[in-house]
C-alpha cells in the first residue's frame, strides 16, 4: 500500500557552518523506499544527509488522507494539501524559529488564513520582527498522486 510521507532531512553541505534542513514529500510503501528520491532531491548533500524526523501523513484537519492512483476518480469538491513553513522571532534570541504545517483546504488563500490563526503566527514576533510565511507550497496531488 502506498503512503504519503513528510520527511525532515538534515545535512551540513560542504562550506557551511551549521546544519541545514529541508522538507521532502514522497509516496512509497515504506520510508526506506524513498532514499533514492531523497538523495536526488538534495544533490548538494553529496549523499551525506540524515532523516531528522518523519511522519506518515494519514490525517490533516480532520480529513483522512489516502494515496490513490492517478486514474482513480476523485470528487470535484476534494480539498488539496498545502505545506506551509511559518517563520518568526522571539525578543533577545538570535534565531528565526519555524513552524511547519500541512493544511487541507480548497484553495491556497484558505490555507494561508489557517496558518495565520496558529499560536505560532500570533505570538512569535515583536515590534520590527513580524511573523511571516517563509514558504507556501501546494502538495499538488495532480503531479504526484491524488489524495482523498
Write out the residue ranges for each language-model feature.
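Weak global preference for isoleucine
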Residues: 7-9, 23, 35, 65, ...
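Extended intrinsically disordered, low-complexity coil regions enriched in Ser, Thr, Gly, Ala
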Residues: 16-52, 93-132
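A short linear-motif detector with a strong N-terminal bias
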Residues: 3-6, 31-35, 59-66, 79-83
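Short, mixed-charge low-complexity intrinsically disordered segments
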Residues: 42-79, 121-148
Amino acid at each position: 500500500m502506498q503512503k504519503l510521507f513528510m520527511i525532515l532531512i538534515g545535512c551540513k553541505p560542504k562550506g557551511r557552518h551549521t546544519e541545514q534542513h529541508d522538507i521532502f514529500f514522497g509516496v512509497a510503501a515504506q520510508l526506506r523506499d524513498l532514499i533514492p528520491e531523497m538523495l536526488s532531491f538534495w544533490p548538494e548533500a553529496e549523499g551525506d544527509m540524515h532523516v531528522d524526523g518523519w511522519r506518515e501523513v494519514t490525517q490533516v484537519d480532520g480529513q483522512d488522507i489516502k494515496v490513490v492512483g492517478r486514474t482513480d476518480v476523485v470528487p470535484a469538491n476534494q480539498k488539496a494539501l498545502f505545506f506551509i513553513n511559518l517563520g518568526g522571532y522571539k525578543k533577545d534570541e538570535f534565531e528565526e524559529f519555524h513552524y511547519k504545517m500541512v493544511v487541507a483546504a480548497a484553495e491556497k488563500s484558505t490555507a494561508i488564513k489557517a496558518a495565520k490563526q496558529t499560536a505560532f503566527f500570533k505570538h512569535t514576533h515583536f515590534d520590527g520582527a513580524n511573523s511571516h510565511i517563509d514558504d507556501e507550497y501546494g502538495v499538488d496531488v495532480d503531479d504526484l498522486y491524488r489524495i482523498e
